[in-house]
Amino acid sequence: LLSLQKPKTNFPDEVVFIGYHQITELYFKLALQELMCLGQEKELNKSSFLLRLNRVNRYFEALIRSFSIMVEGMDQKEFLRFRMALLPASGFQSVQYRQIELYSTDLLQLVTLSKRGEFSKTDPAEKLYPYIYWKFGATEQLTGKKTLTLTQFEERYDQELLTLSKHCMTLNLWQLYKKLPAEDQKDIAVIEALKSNDLNVNVYWPLAHYKSAVRYLAKSDQDIAATGGTNWQKYLPPKFQKRIFYPELWSFEEKETWGKGWVEDQIKSILKGF
């Protein structure tokens, strides 16, 4: 891992940026392993389901707690200078994160919000995949065209992710949960573990990134594009994307206000520094 750290500039904080992204991918690898193991269980039960799901939750909680390394741990001026050397690379291109999403929920829940109502859970992956939300997240703000970041990612991983989408239609976390005995599906520990997973992946983790983006990229008069050209103002906030893995576990009000309060509180505190 250390040998792979090859900064493109002489700014010390670029090493912080690279190192933390490596740490993130290591935790993603651990989370993926647990999700894949769950799908391979021949006799899935509540105990094994909770064991592995709680492991996934701990990995994400560790990442969320440690994200201050990114938010507070780099000099803004240095970041704005070395970031240009990283183009078109972006955290957006983490294929492991996309895999975690596919292993977590029905593909319909990952369809971009504006198109989700046009499909159903029974639609094949080939029909749903072209409208997965992140395909609309790395577009040029002025033209709406795909960025080089997105184009390169699609060329390298689209077929692999489509194949995985098909595989996960019956083996994602939600479908595995539905295979548990009815009594176990009502177990508070199981429900709370799923809800924690939903919040960790779809609220707290994206918002940690949003907090960092506001600190480094937001200005009072204009916003700077992210390293991969991601339209981060619309891509990161949960209230815009409404990515909810397990909507059946949440109340109407909870879904309507998904991530809203956290965003408003965090952004107010950060903007005070400008």
Regions found by a protein language model. Name each.
Residues 1-274:
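Surface-exposed peri-terminal alpha-helical interaction modules
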